[in-house]
Structures are given as C-alpha cells and as structure tokens.
C-alpha cells in the first residue's frame, strides 16, 4: 500500500493513499482515536482563533478536535451538527452537503436548542481536514441559518487547492494524488 508521510505539530503519521475516483486519490487522515495528534494540534489552532463564543463542528471526525479546542478556550460547550435527525431534536434546521469523501448527498442538522444557543454569537467552524470546502460551506450555511456569525474556519489540514484559500486557518497542507 502506498502511503504519504505527514508531519504536523512535531508528529509524524504514515497516511494510506486511498483512491476516490479514476483521477483522484487522497492521503487518508483520521483523527478519531488519535489522542496525541488532537492534543498537539488543538492548542496550535486555538492560538490562531479570534475571540469566539462557540466552536461548531459536523460529525464525526471533527468532534475530538472541537472538544479539545473548546476545553483549551474555557468554553463550557461546543455544538455538533448531526448527519441525521435524532429523536431528541425538536424543529431541527437542515442544509444539504456534498463531500469529497462521501458518495451520496447528505444533510446536516442542527437541533433547535443548539441553534438558539448560537444565535447572534461568534462561532468558529472546526474540522479535521478542509478539502473542496463543500462540507465547510454547508456547515457555514447551517450556522448562519441559525443566526450565528462565523468569525473563523479552521482545520488541522488543508487538502489540495484548499491550501491556497485565505479564509481558513490550517496547520499543514495535504496534497492530493
């Protein structure tokens, strides 16, 4: 199996290169379960963020990073946009999303109670990797629909052309193949 050697936050990871289509492969970066990488990268991202009231992420891979950044910033909670409607959700708001790593169109949902918490607040959108930006754009639409003010968008890695974006915070670039 081909791999890509990633260096980030003083750590090294061998990422398997995964074929997504006939002309696109990516280095698969998964932070779920990697406590060390979350622990090292979260403070670096937190330092780059402006003042925020809430951290918002989409399930699932951004959750540990959102938790750790929230903890570092002394925020009492963070918000997770879900990929399906849960029984506890009352009047959820929703947007559609198309992601490079997901074959079918998906939706993101925000519980009405969470939407009310972030209304009029400064939020930072957090993810593990920003690639085409479609997931991030959907998350931004969702929180803006809730009335929040997006003041930052951040990830550990910017994949492919995302590295050239000026509107995101990231620690390292990740090539596509």
Labelled PLM ranges:
Residues 52-59:
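Short glycine-rich phosphate-binding loop at a beta-alpha junction
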Residues 1-52:
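Active-site-facing substrate-recognition patch
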Residues 65-73, 140:
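Short Gly/Thr/Asp-enriched flexible loops that form oxyanion-binding sites at enzyme active sites
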Residues 73-74, 95-100, 169-172:
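Short, hinge-like loop/turn segments at secondary-structure boundaries
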Residues 78-123:
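Short, glycine/charge-rich flexible loops or terminal/linker lids adjacent to PRPP-binding catalytic cores
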Residues 53, 121, 151:
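Conserved acidic residues
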Residues 4-5, 137-177:
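PRPP-dependent phosphoribosyltransferase catalytic core
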Residues 59-65, 132:
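Gly/Ser/Thr-rich loops at beta-strand to alpha-helix junctions
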């Amino acid at each position: 199996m081909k791999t890509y050697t990633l260096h980030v936050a003083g750590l090294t990871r061998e990422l398997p290169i995964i074929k997504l289509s006939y002309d696109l492969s990516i280095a698969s970066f998964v932070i779920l379960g990697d406590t060390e990488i979350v622990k090292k990268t979260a403070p670096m991202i937190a330092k780059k963020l402006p003042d925020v009231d809430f951290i918002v992420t989409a399930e699932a891979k951004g959750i540990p990073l959102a938790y750790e950044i929230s903890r570092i910033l002394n925020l009492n909670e963070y918000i997770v946009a879900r990929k399906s409607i849960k029984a506890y959700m009352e009047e959820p708001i929703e947007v559609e999303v198309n992601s490079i790593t997901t074959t079918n169109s998906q939706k993101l949902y925000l519980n009405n109670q969470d939407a009310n918490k972030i209304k009029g607040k400064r939020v930072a959108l957090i993810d593990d990797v920003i690639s085409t930006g479609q997931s991030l754009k959907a998350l931004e639409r969702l929180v803006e629909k809730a009335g929040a003010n997006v003041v930052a968008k951040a990830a550990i890695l910017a994949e492919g052309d995302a590295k050239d974006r000026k509107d995101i915070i990231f620690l390292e670039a990740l090539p596509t193949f």
